[in-house]
Each structure stands twice: as C-alpha cells, then as structure tokens.
Amino acid sequence: RTKEAEEVAQALVGMYLYDTVIDTIVCMEGTEVIGAFLAEELAKGGFLSTNAHKSIYVISPEFNNNSQIIFRDNLIPMIRDKHVMILMASVTTGRTLNKAVESIQYYGGILQGASAIFSAMDSLDGVPIKSVFGKKDLPDYTYSDYRDCPLCKAGKKIDALVNTFGYSPMG
C-alpha cells in the first residue's frame, strides 16, 4: 500500500544529513514504490542532486546467471559518476548489499550509503546502513544458515521464514 511506502520513505529521509547528495536510488528486492516516495521526500527536504534536471533517478538492476548485479546500457549513465543510495527491503547477512555495492563501484557510481526497512547490521565494510527497524526492535531476531539451523538440529519445526516477500508461515 502506498501509505506505508510513503511512511517508510519519510522515516528514512529523516536519518540523512541535509548536505547528503543523492542523484540515484537503486531499488533492490521490490522497493521501487518506496524508492519513488524516497526520491520525492529527498527533493521536498531540500537534499542536493547534481543531476541537471534536479530530480532523482529511481532504478532497479538485473541479476545475471551468476547472480551478479548488472545494469543495462540505458541505466549506466544514471550510475556512472552519480551519488548513489541503495534501497533494500532487508539486510540480514549483507550478501545482497555487498553485490550491490560491488556493482555500483564497477559501473563508476559514488556510493552514499544504504537504506532498508529492516537491517540486522548498522554498516557493512564501511558502508553505513540506515534502517527503519533494526535488531533493537526485534531483540530475539537471529539468522542461521540453512545448513546450521539450531532449531532444525534440535528437532524443532520452524514457525515461519522471513524474506523480501514477507513473512511465510511453515504450516
């Protein structure tokens, strides 16, 4: 729903300093609606953009067969030499965020940071992560590799899985 997307964008915008320059928001994990509201909120808040038209690009990448993040030729000018923010639904292990960072660096972008609805970490390899919700909000939150799940090893069934699509009960 758009109301919640707008509220998430408003919460995230309040976490950035007004001298932060954002030219492009790279939306991961289906966050395009939030990204559009975030671009609007940044513009309304007086945040800077070096784009000639003074608006912020909102784009999404593709994944190739090796799960690498790529951008098509028409999107590369929106990354190269641009101040880029990564927007994610959740950051748990940092693997997807790391792939996004590598891709933006490969295409010549200037990484400004990452934003997420939920993040289990505050930063990844020096990249700050601003999130609406974090481990302080879910103190019992844990992540386990599927090969090393303590509940599975104890013979207990998992109640649910959480991924970018949401909460999925394991009925």
Q: PLM features: residue spans?
A:
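Short, highly selective alpha-helical patches that border small-molecule cofactor pockets
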Residues: 5, 9, 31, 35-39, ...
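Short glycine-rich phosphate-binding loop at a beta-alpha junction
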Residues: 19-31
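PRPP-dependent phosphoribosyltransferase catalytic core
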Residues: 101-171
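A phosphate-binding catalytic loop at a beta-strand-loop-alpha-helix junction
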Residues: 91-100, 104
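Active-site-facing substrate-recognition patch
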Residues: 1-21, 164-171
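Hydrophobic Val/Ile/Leu positions in short beta-strands of Rossmann-like dinucleotide-binding domains
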Residues: 27, 86-87
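Conserved acidic residues
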Residues: 22-23, 82, 112
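Short, glycine/charge-rich flexible loops or terminal/linker lids adjacent to PRPP-binding catalytic cores
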Residues: 35-85, 92-95
